[in-house]
Amino acid sequence: MRQDRTTHLTADINSSALILNLGSVSNIGKGVVEIDDEMIWLDSYDRVSSTATAAPYGRGYQGTTAASHTTNTKVTISPTFPRLSVKRAINDSIKAVFPQLFGVDKTTFSLTATQSTYSLPSAIDDVLGVSWDTPGPTGEWMPVKQWRHDKMANSATYATGQTISVYDRITPGRTVQVTYSKEPSILVNNNDVFETVTGLPSSAKDVIVYGASYRLASFIDPGRLTFTSAEADQADTKIQFGSGSNAARFMLALYQQRLAEEAGKLRGQYPVRIHYTRY
């Protein structure tokens, strides 16, 4: 598998500029380059002035978004795995682990003596547990044993369409806490914190990495990745066709194994709690 060739910008460019000032054009040719998350199709280059010219349609190529880029930003030439493709694979993996893996969050409300049913956030998938803040100095949160989660609540009365009804005798005015599972959220920004944004535990990071890896490798056979380099013919005699598919299957097996392990750990951390309900 060849190493991506790189250079850098020597001047800022805005989202509509077609002339790129580069640190080196020795590896540049007509084709695609990547700057940050943007793909750009280059139509020509000038070795004397170390510039490259994008085609009129070249900015924001292959579904990326044209953006401004600053001096010294890395320019990757014909990237094997474009950043946008990697990000999509990561987010596809995050979405695919649900419901085996799920995010956990909490919501609270104050109990009213005349009210038994309360609105819940629309993001709730299932209620994992309910507790309430008991009076006095003990600081104990007592489990609520009688409650009902309604996923099909009347939307005219409850905007989110989800409610919980509490039937235990709880001191009015006390805080009730609902712990619930939800679908993991995808990553959006480059500086997003995995645990904070997705809601998944930090130990699940490698599950997402394996999931993204097998998705990317499934479409590219590493035994044929060197077709753009001078040693292509020699490499083809040493690396059997299909090695990419084999690598993808291996990573898929690792993904499935780690997914099962993390799912078991999550079930152990949040076991099904017995409670009374009404129908």
Identify the function of each model-found stretch.
Residues 57:
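Arg/Lys-rich RNA-binding interfaces used to dock onto structured RNA substrates
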Residues 1-14, 27-53, 65-279:
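Glycine-enriched, solvent-exposed interface loops adjoining structured elements
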Residues 17-23, 61-62:
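Short alpha-helix capping/helix-loop boundary micro-motifs
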